Amino acid sequence: MSQQKDRPNDRKAERLVKEAAEAARAEETLIATRKAKAARLRDRGENPFANDVTAGEPLTELAAVRARFDGARAAAEPKAEGAAPDRPAADRYDPASVEPLPFRVAGRVLFVRSFGGVTFVRLRDRTGELQLYCEQGSLAEFERLEDIDLGDFIEARGVAMATQKGELSIRAERLRLLTKAYRPLPTKTSFKDVESRYRMRYVDLVANPHVAGVFRARSAIVAALREFLDARGFLEVETPTMHTLVGGATAKPFKTHHNALDLELFLRIAPELFLKRLVVGGFERVYEIARCYRNEGLSTRHNPEFTMIEYYQAYATYETLMDGTEAMLRHVDARLAERLPAEHAAWVAQRTYSLERFARVPMAEGIARALSKSGLPADVPQRIAADDAPIKEWAKAAKASGREIDWTNFRAGAKKCESPGELVFSAYEYVVEPFLTRDYRTEAGDKSIP
């Protein structure tokens, strides 16, 4: 019986291995073909890996070309009842309203479609996408299009136009290959494994260009943080990354060795200790946007190498810092709305919280509120620490209320607690939604006030 069960699995494994081998052979063939094209270019005296663009008028970003013709956007055409949805009105342009202005553009080739004497080439640069309209009678290098593959980088010069279907395009008059791509471009369907996407972000950016919004948002956030703190008299500093002592948090550090000094060192888990020393030295307002390292678990939401910000202010209470943190987050949000309006609108639509004045709740009270809201009993922390916990029943109740709780790590952390205060802090980490916390447990941190 077991052998009969194994046979379908064996056949499936064999099929997957065969498909992988066929895909590898197909890719090798494709790479060989592209290398042959590069060789032909060299034979003609052309460099398939140029490090310059043609001298002359400057390159125009593709989004700027679209922006130039905002006034030529066409209204949506009425559709027959039951007709399939067409291109959105925002992407349709009136051919009579698009002036034949000259542009020089460059970007990565996303697709090439040929229809006899006309070839359409879609380009992408860092700002967006645009189509090239390549006509045999207008483009001097029309025959060279045979050497263009998906993923290649090209530059083109021509005039703006709109096709009969309302697609804004550049009617190409000159075209030049800048860089030949040997490997085929990944697609959303061929590159969708979450772990692979996080490990190879550069490939993910090609297959899923919307991911670039995350990078742009991070840049805007860091700039806004600096702007906010600098305007309030804080001094940005850089402190050592390698420490002789482990401090600033309770996380496990990465270890390294200094050969010249024969000294064991630790990559910092937080910049706290040196920032406090600077306050002692007389800098009353300091901050650092620091790269930190914690030798612990990892996931798509938890990276052992990460960036954090810490700021310290003399003559201020923790209530003062709460006010400052609220104002900082609102400032960052406003800057994101200015720099990335489309992405920001989408993020706001997904929010389940407000950036107005935050709730300031004692830690124990916050846990009680969260448990009640999730349909859970008030003694969850005590029972989970005592191994008297109907986890499946609780998980079902929490999920019904819209909450997802990491019960495995919650239970593991609760069992390690040596005092009621530590148990309260552990429960807070896994149960409570983010808000500003008062009455921090002294057992859980040396920065709390007894």
What are these regions (language model features)?
Residues 2-7, 12, 16-27, 32-320, ...:
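Class II aminoacyl-tRNA synthetase-like tRNA-binding/catalytic domains
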Residues 105, 324, 447-449:
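Residue-level detector of well-ordered alpha-helical segments, enriched
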Residues 217, 266, 317-324, 358, ...:
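Short, contiguous, pocket-lining structural segments
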Residues 247-253, 331, 335-450:
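Metal-assisted phosphate- and nucleotidyl-transfer catalytic regions
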Residues 326-328:
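Short amphipathic alpha-helices in soluble, non-transmembrane regions
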